[in-house]
Structure formats: structure tokens, C-alpha cells
Amino acid sequence: MIKFNTKLLFLSFLLLISLRPLQSAEMVDPIKVDWSFKGLTGTFDRASLQRGFQVYKEVCASCHSMQYLSYRNLGEPGGPEFSEQEVKAIAASFEIEDGPDSQGEMFTRPGKPSDKFKSPYPNTQAATAANGGAYPPDMSVLVKARKGG
């Protein structure tokens, strides 16, 4: 004859009931959204990209470089799409070290759209020293470092 342990049966029942919400949470499908940037012909929201550049310029640029991008990239289709005059003004707001001149000296000049984004640090060692031993990643290749980027 089989004896039933009521306490064990009751605890087993409670365990099954407590696992039920976990099972139902796994079965929920994510909401499907039609993103504007989905697919080969997708586009990004221009105003959103311009705000993103503003955030980079005001916050991120104090530590992070974008050494693989030129100022002219800000005016390209699919990017922030600033006008040619805006790109020139953005580039000119930076002092770029150039040269050497005819005397062999380096000099500074206003930036041009063809210039690469100015780095906040002169070299890797200065960037590492200014950030407690950690080198801030370059923001121009950050997307490629992410899954699906």
C-alpha cells in the first residue's frame, strides 16, 4: 500500500504553480515594428542623426576620437546630411595642425571638409594617461564592434 506524504505533495503543487509564470513569459512574442532603417533601402531619421552628432560634439568628443571619419561625411546621403555650408562651418570651427610650411615649421589653420575629425588627444599615451589608464574607443568604428553592426 502506498502512503502519501501530504507535505511533499503540497510543496510539489506550490512549486508547479510558482513556475507557471516563468513558462508563460517565455512564450510572449516581441512586438513587430517597421523601422525606417530596416533593409537595404532603409533610411535613418535625419534630425535624429543630427542630434546624435550634437551629442557627440558636446559630450563624447572630449574623450573619444572619430579618426576614420572626415568632416565631409556629415553631408553625405544616409548620414546627418548637413548642407555644404554647414559642413564647412563645422570643419572651420576646429584648428587643424598642418605643415610643414616652406621653413619646415608646423602651423595651424581652420579645418576643411576633407580633414579627418580632430582627436581630443595628441597621441594614445596622452589619452590613456588622461583616462586613468584606459584608452577611450574610437567612435567611428563603434558600430562595427557591436553584434549586428
Predicted regions and their residues:
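N-terminal secretory signal peptides
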Residues: D101-R109, P113-D115
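Short, contiguous pre-domain boundary segments
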Residues: P30-L40, D115-T124, A129, S140
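C-type cytochrome heme c attachment motif
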Residues: Q54-M66, K118-P122, Y135-K144
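Post-cleavage N-terminal segment of exported redox proteins
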Residues: I2-T43
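Electrostatic cytochrome c docking/interface patches
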Residues: D29-Q54, S65-E84
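Active-site-surrounding "flap" and adjacent substrate/cofactor-binding loops of secreted or lumenal enzymes
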Residues: E76-G104
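Thiol/selenol-based redox catalytic cores and closely related redox-interacting motifs
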Residues: R109, P113, N123-G149
